[in-house]
Amino acid sequence: MNGKPEWEKGVTMGIGKGTFAPLFVRRLRYCVVALALLIASGILTHVSAEPAKKKTLGLAITAWRTALYETPDGKEECPDGLTLGGDQVWLNMLTPEQRDKVTRHGTVETTQLRDFALERGPHGEDVCWNPAVVNDPPQKTVQGKKSYGVNLDGTDDGHATPRTCAHEKFVTPDGARGIDNQWYRVIGCTYGWRAAGGYTEEMPNGELRDGGHPILVEITGIDDLRNSTNVEVAFYHSTDGMIKDNAGNILPNSSYRVAKDYLYTTHGSIVDGVLTTVPIDIHFPFYAHFMHSERFIKDARLRLDLAPDGKSAAGLVAGYYDLDSFWSYMERIGELFTVAHFDCPALYEAVHRLADGYPDPKTGECTAISAGFSVTAVSGYIIHLDAKTAQASAPAGEVR
Amino acid sequence: MRIFLRHGIAATLALALFGCGPGEPQSPGGAPQVRRLTEEQYRQVIADLFGKDIKVAGHFDPLNRTDGLLEIGASRAAITSSAFEQYDLIARQVAAQVVDADHREVLVPCSPASDSAPDAACAKAFFARIGPLLYRRPLEAKTLERLVDVSGVAAASVHDFYAGLAFGLAGMLETPEFLFVADYTEPDPDRPGGHRLDAYSRASRLSFLLWDTMPDAALMKAAQDGDLNSKRGLRRQVDRMLASPRLDAGVRAFFSDMLGFDTFDTLAKDPIIYPAFVQSVADDAQEQTLRTITNLLIANKGDYRDLFTTRDTVMSGPLGLLYDVPVTKPDGWVPYRFPDDDPRAGIITQLSFVALHSHPGRSSATLRGKAVREIFLCQKVPDPPGNVNFALVQDTKNPNYKTARQRLTAHRSAPTCAGCHKIMDPMGLALENFDGAGQYRTVENDVPIDASGEVDGVKFQGAAELGKVVHDNPVTTSCLVNRLYGYAVGRPPVAGEKDWMKYLQAGFAENGYRVPDLLRLIATSDAFYAIAPAGAQSASEPSPTGARS
Amino acid sequence: MIEALSRRSILRGILGGSAITVGLPLLDCFLDGNGTALASGAPLPIRFGTWFWGLGHTPGRAIAIKDGTDYAFLENCAALSPFKSQINFFTNFNTPTDGEPNIPHDTGHFAGLAGNCPSAYGDIPSPTFDVLISDAIGQASRFRSLEVTASGNPRDSLSARGTGNFNAAEPSPFRFYTRLFGPEFADPNKADFKPDPRVMVRQSVLSAVKDEASSFAGGLGSADKARMDEYFTSVRQMEQQLNLQMQKPAPAEACKIPASPGENTPIGTEIFTAINTHKIMTQLLVMAVACNQTKVFNMSFSASASQYRKPGDSATNHTLTHEEPVDAALGYQPISDWFATRSMESMATFVDAFAQVREGDGTLLDNCMIFAHTDTNYARLHALDGIPMMSVGKAGGRIKTGMHIAGNGDPVTRVGLTMMQVMGLAVDQWGTRSLKTSKPVTEIVV
């Protein structure tokens, strides 16, 4: 309309939109706009516009599993079948007469033959502590094209870069391309990591559920649980266990005190309920097989779906899994090869061959391997104990 | 100086009115009681006698709640065959532990001449020491003889001195003298022809009231020396016991009884509807309320009425789950204070009340309202009529009432229902923000909860205000006095005690509604030890020493 | 030790002709050639039990009454059909209250059990008739009676002596097993038997306990004296247990010690848990009877205002009976009806367990009389009149079975009186005020 006052342009009131509004409505409009201007100018100072209070979400990670794509019969991803356990590999090396003798005509359980299968280095070395001293048939690796995970190196085709080694990429089951998950390639056809075997990762998850100490993720500076542009994300380790209901599910709303000397911080953003974080190097502790271990993940980043009610979350931790960290766990659980069906020398060889991150400056060989781990979490109160005053505070404005 | 004098005069007056006896109305007393030990008392007595590491593994028959208290039910409780079987089993197990190699050095005061034969002298020393403690009074000579005989025969039969002791001890643990706390009377020197509680029964009454256990050595000695028959001697013991940390146990036992915590044993919550209500939550809920009570009433010498408004409590890890609050020490107990505007205020809003008085899968305004009335206001709600027609509730036009308030509308409008439900539902409806497991909620089936109510003409909004209403209601404190006195004497007050009860209520008010002071008032009174005259209760002649009339 | 027990030595009592009566254990050598009676001509011992469920049936869905004494089971009671020939079904017996309140889920069953209407919850005005029966026939067994519940709550017992105390029910299968078949159990089929000298010592200790207690009881008032009487009864039962431990028990053909239920067997008010608990408890109870541990038993399938619920449902059975709308098409409350059917299925489990035990020429059920009863005719209205009752088992041939008996409005106590007479009690009148009766249900008495 011509002659519209300047201050009426650009103010969408919604009253009589698109029609010629009656005079009293127009007058009303003018009043409302005038009022708005007065408020904005601070003349009516008792009407203040306070910034929305920032909120915090505390999460405890309840389970950690390799994000492993598998089909029920395994044929798509493992056309050559699953890997053989070290005991089977060893037995295959024997002549039929030797095999018959050592198994006492097949009556002895292979778990009992475990020590023979382990200590078969040329000088009797344990081949999980010294995997390079023997040459075993190679690891059966994933041949399929699909995997969960994230594009870690930023390339489309996995070509070598100053920080990565050349490797093949995957496509997610939903069709997202450029996925780096060499770790899956290495162990995706090993029984112990797959759902049916579930051994190597279900043991630590079981320990966690039975009162173990979880890793905590504290997200602060949240404007809105669905969308927040800049949040702080801290990783802690707790000294308190999780509480289960009678069906074995972890309950939300527990309180967790943070352990001293374990802290990693980064930034992130929440878009449509999904939190993504800026990569940093993180050591993730866990307890399994009667010992403390850790997964050292370089360039670790989260991609977490936050439930709208703020009670749970699920998603991925992706990054480059440091091979030394991996092997220091494997060499101590070597004896599980009979039930998890892995062969240490073959596994060691494959994971080094297929590693694609952080090349050694001297040798050029990659020392970390791209990986994706699926995690689940429930919400809880993260308790910070101030050593000086022994006061405890829980972050204000908990999200619910 | 004048101020001091004024206070001093006021104090003296108060003392004169409420502490000195002459101002105290007479009580005719009730019949002598014979009260079965509660499970808690049994366990505590064994621990006091033989040490905390003696295991008591067995189960105890439940007591019937009578006139609001299990302790009054204890005065009527019998011992059934199956209960006796259990007492026998427990007795043998306890006795076996007492004499075993780990314990006999400490618990048997002498060594026998031979381990595999009777030794009358050592057996006598053992039973002479343990007998009076077990029976809570001196052992009669013939009883001691009998015990030495029985254990001697046993020892000879199984060629084991200690086993012989254990047989005798086990027998003692299943006699009525042990299992029941009985009122023994003796002739009253101040009232010829009348009877009074004897000193040892006084000691037992006092000890079970204040500490929920048998009299300790000092109290037994006071009984023996006749101190408990004098006001001064009695007050000295009462003050000693009130100052002891063992008072906590007595106060906890009373409130545990009054609040009906025995029903926690069979409390079940549907694990699908309330997955978070696990066993550790149920256990901690009771503990939370009992600690709230002892913190306020004993440690802080607070006003009883503040139990219904206080926001100060304690939290444990499992409770933090249900209350949805941070707990700074999840593996223990921490003080916790709810914010000033929080609906959680007072013990009625704690889990031990709202979760206990609910159904397994939903809340219940009626159960909660009834519980407030019966527990805290001592008002008996009549039983529901037998022939009630529920067709009114089952309105076929609205088969799914969205909120409890809507569902209970018929309760309050139908004439046959309204009379009773009017006095229950409005209180309970104020607590509807707490679901069947005690968790806070603002909506039920997507409809916002309206937590307004009215009690005896007083309107209020929400749980915290309900607490204030109970705080301010004069019946609340007289109910507590009534209950505590009934707990103390094992019977409801009798008709002739009207003035005495009024006196107690006035004293409670004078002392700022402090429970330890009320306990002192009761424990040092004549009324607490008064026994109805012989002939009123039974026709049997009193025995010369230590028999009940 | 006596190798072959002669009838005479047992009759005289192994304790050398003492005054203690020893119940006759059932030996095959005592049976007549037909296995239907003792060689002396006396009938086989009859066992008595009660089985209680809360909240009745859905009216019109329990039985169809036919001509004469014929009847058929309907939907609620379908599971009982295989046992119809053992069951008498009583309808139209009423509960006059003489002005006492109809205390919901209380008056209904106590009137017929105690012969008296209670005046308040927790008031048990006189002994329930199972106690009168067990006092008469149960003294010589290891247990005078056994009370069990499937609900997990020891207060769910309807057996009481009338002093205001009830006989607590056993809620835990593991504890029940330990009590029955644990260290104190004497296996009747074990070849060797050595009386434990320690038992004799315990007997002398109990004797001293009784002496002690007698002087204690001497000075009590009358109300407390009644409680002491119960104490002495309990001590006597313990003495009886010890007596039995001093003799080799007679072999019991059907006695097979069952496996122990796990210590962590779930107990609770979720309906399927309760059904399972009931099944386990039934097995233990039946074996206890088959092993001659008791002659009287009481099973509470549920509390009277049954708190059972389907998992995930927020309403209990009791709440549903009041709040569930009557389905317009079906004409009844569907979920409440579902619970009634589940109750009867469990009753069938109970009855079947007795029917599976062979005894003489027939089964243990043939030598039992079980009183199956409930607290209301129509739970929705707490209706007191026409509360359904059943007798199950042939009582050793002393009663006729398979009949429907119409009460014509007579008091429920007629059934209790009949049962006491069948069990051999010398009682010709029972109950107070309008519940007083001297008319047994002669139609079922042989």
Per-segment meaning from a language model:
Chain A
Residues 30-42:
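Bacterial N-terminal signal peptides
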Residues 16-32:
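Bacterial N-terminal signal peptides that target proteins for export
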Residues 50-400:
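Extracytosolic secretory-pathway proteins
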